[in-house]
Amino acid sequence: MMRNRVDMEGNIMAAIIGSPTRYIQGKGEMMNLCSYADKFGKNLFILTSASGRKRVEPAINEGNKDSNLVYDVFNGECCMTEINRIIKIVEEAGSDVIIGIGGGKIHDTSKAVAYYTKKPVIIVPTIASTDAPCSALSVIYTDEGVFEKYLFLPSSPDMVMVDTDIVCKAPVRLLISGMGDALATYFEARACKRSDASNCVGGKCTLAAMNLAQLCYDTLMENGVQAMIAAKEGICTKAVENVIEANTYLSGIGFESGGLAGAHAIHNGFTAIPETHKMYHGEKVAFGTLVQLVLEDAGEDEIMEVIDFCSEIGLPVTLKGLGIEEVKPEQIMEVARLACAPDDTMGNMPLDVQPEDLYAAIMGADALGRYYTEE
């Protein structure tokens, strides 16, 4: 984990913003991948899914001049078992650069492999479902899919490349999930600012990062519904392009350089309930955002704007929406205890949060969600 910049009394002094060396977004960019990667070397290791390879390989091959490509199929979980398996393949292949093509767990795994093998990494999202691509962070789970730890990396990816033609062809639920993840960015950055917490790159939030987090939220409010409607029809409008940038870049820089707080800690707590494992990351984070607002005693207008937005685009605002058909108090309390773990980000909230407080906020958020969506 990157050390915080501190003075002699242990107070964090520097404001730090982290970002990829280069961010590229446009239509048909997959054909240019090998030429972009050429600056790092000719031997490219590409981690993707079996279906992802079928979608991207023709375009990559069409644009490839003289690079040597080694593909490997991701096993589905960003865990140390998978990371170590891939490290062995990379070392045996003599690869120069790690390229992760796919979704959030492929990105996190690729970044971890690049870190442990000391190689550059290029992240290529084929979906806009999380803000993982731009961050210097990998979220590590157990083999069974339960949150284990954050792996804080010394730098952001060397390059992030988004081919919007490919992203627009993904199921719309993935774009919506990305909006759920991005929804938390501003509120968590605001909480960290209020509590004077450090961000994920070991410093304080810069003006630029806070404004990117605010722009992320504003972009969702202004474009989210239009983007969802267009994406359902497979149409890549300007609203869809804007949301892809918000989900990927604005949220990525905003969360990492603004900081994480309650919403993501709550997401991590919910991994303890098996029924939620079928939900996407951003869907759980969206409900975590609502819980965080209840925990903060946010204004009714703000809470209602979030509930209305989530309801309109299809993000969960109730426990039932997370797949929990039977709410068991002991399970919710376990979620609260896990979310309040000392090594998670609940400690960045501008108030002391005990598991009992969080339990009440979860149940309160569920009640609000049911009240406003079932009336």
Where does each model-flagged region fall?
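ATP/NTP phosphate-donor binding region
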Residues: M2-V97, L319
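C-terminal charged capping/lid subdomain of soluble metabolic enzymes
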Residues: R3-G10, N32, A298-E375
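Structural motif
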Residues: R22, N43-F45, D96-I99, P120-I122, ...
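Short glycine/serine/threonine-rich phosphate/pyrophosphate-binding segments
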Residues: M30-L33, R53-E57, M80, K105-A112, ...
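A short, small-residue-rich loop immediately preceding and capping a beta-strand
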Residues: V90-I127
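A glycine/threonine-rich phosphate-anchoring loop and its flanking beta-alpha core
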Residues: Y116-A208
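Active-site segments that bind and position negatively charged phosphate/pyrophosphate groups
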Residues: C200-L315
